[in-house]
Each structure stands twice: as C-alpha cells, then as structure tokens.
Amino acid sequence: MELELDLLTGLQLLSEYCPRVTPNAPPRRASVAVIIAFKESQDFSNPKWPQCIPITSVPYVLLIQRSFRDTDRWSGHMALPGGTRSLTDKSDIQTAHRETLEEVGIDLRKEHAHFVGALDERVITSNWGQFPLLLLSSFVFILPYMPSLRLQESEVFSAQWYPLADLLLPECQTRIQIDSSRALKKTYPRFIKTLFHLAVGNLMYSAIRLEFDPSSATYSLPPYQRPFLRGITHSIFVDLFIFLSPSSARHCLCWSLPYFQHYDLRFIASFFTQFYRLRLHQVYPRGNWVFTCLNGYYPYLKLTLLVGFLFRLFLVYLLFLIISAYYKS
C-alpha cells in the first residue's frame, strides 16, 4: 500500500476546517504547536508561499523531549512545544505562541510563520477516561525554513526536526507496554497496584519508533531509555494525517486499539469488542479519533477484567476439585 503525504492539499483542507469545540470542558486548558518547516528555504516574499511549496520539498516537524522531572506526569516524553494556559493569555493560540517562544525560542508571530488551522479540541483524562485533567488545543503552523532553536532546559531536554513522512513508515509502527495499574486512582495503596499489575499485566499501546539525530541529546541516552512517540502527541499526529495522508488514515496504519499482554484477557477482550472494532473499520477516521475510540473501548476493558477475574476463579476452583478428587482416589 502506497502511503501518500499530500502536504498542499492537506494544509488547504485544514485551513478550511472548523474544529469542534468541547462542551463542558474542564477549566484547566493547554495548547501545543505543530510546527512544520523545510530544510530548503521557501520563497516567503510571496504572501501565498504556502500554496507554492514545491512537491520535492521535504516537510519536517519539530518534536521535543520533555525534561526529566519527578513531578511531571509526562516526564521525558516526546511532545510538541506547548503548555498550560496562564491567566495573562487572552486565547489558546496565544498560549501556543508564548510556550513555543519560551521552550524552543521560536517566535511564531515572526519568523514568517503561517498559521494553517486548528485540530479538534481533546479532553485529556486519566484512569481509563474516568477523570478529566485538562482541555488541549492543537494549532498547526508552517514555516518557510528551520529557525535556530534555543531550548529552555528546565522544560525541554532535547529537540529535533523530524521528517513528517517518516512517522508513517510501517517499520516504525510498534507497540509499547504500559502498566495497567495506571487505571487505578493515585490514592490506592501501592500493594493494591502491585497486585493489580501482577494479575492484569501490561496494556500494549500503539507507538512510533523514532530515529534520533546523533547531534540530539536524546541520542546520547541508552537505547532502552530513548522514548517513543506515543500517547497524546501520537493522537495529535493521527488527527493531522487525516488531512495530510488520507490513505494511512483510512486504514488506521499509524494507530490501533490497545490490547492486554496476558492472552486470556486478550481473547476475552477480542470477543467482547469484535463488533465495536468492526464499526470502527467501517467509518472514516474523524477529528479526535484516538480519544473517541478509547472512550468507547474502555468500558469493554473493564468488562474484560470482571469476566477474566471470574474465569480465573473458576479455573482455580476446577483445579481444586481435580486435586481433591485425585487425593481421595
């Protein structure tokens, strides 16, 4: 299957798109900037230069690795420039401007940056969608060249311009293990979380394996510590490729639903979700696709845990009966 990245058409569609606003959103808000640029400087003397980008020009996107902090929920993760909206910010896009300037030193109000459009808002949740944390807005910008970066070390460990099309390569699509006990509240005792993890195992989530530039600080990390593109940032690119790469979006090539590490739970979940998965495959992905799919999927995971627990109890009881009958005979 040929994966096409139609940048010009995608940017045009995105510029005409009216992003959906989330009703009853949590009060805490944050914004990120998806910044696309080119190694070969474009002719920005023409005000309509984004419509005249040569087909041979290779688009890059700016990715950052967050600094390592114990207090940060997303410590060390791959991300996009951005952060929480402050009281002085008059709008969500102003938050993206301010945070980008602070974190990587790019002034999006200068640098000949062109604002393309916004993706759908998404509510970031925890505990398998139970608790809303914040509302995230994503804004897409395109620059005619790659400006120099000035990293805020307290927030950003490293940054790299990454080929946008490489995020679609089949060999870069992978799965990573995420501790299933993260579905529990933080107030639960540690031994409860440990028992839950032993019983349930990990959840296998979609992710993208990245190739880091040798000049990047991330490259200096041991291979097992180098991060994947996953989670929230991954979901933003899934939405972006709905516009830029319809072929990959149609077949959900860069994201799919998570599954359990343990085979018995995986089988039970597959049984309960077979019609749900079929419905998803019959519709074309739309805005906020990852979180929409997960919000409908998490109830099936909870049902799987209940049925799986009862099934395992039944097996233990059956084993007990067999052993008892053996010793009696």
From Swiss-Prot:
* Subcellular localization(s) per the UniProt record: Membrane
Show where the Nudix hydrolase domain sits.
27-185
List, alphabetically, the InterPro entries matched: CoAse, NUDIX_hydrolase-like_dom_sf, NUDIX_hydrolase_dom
TM regions (residue ranges): 123-143, 227-247, 303-323
Give UniProt keywords alphabetically. Membrane, Transmembrane, Transmembrane helix
Q: Which SUPFAM superfamilies match?
A: Nudix (SSF55811)
Report the protein name in the record: Uncharacterized protein C14C4.10c
Q: Which organism is it from?
A: Schizosaccharomyces pombe (strain 972 / ATCC 24843) (Fission yeast)
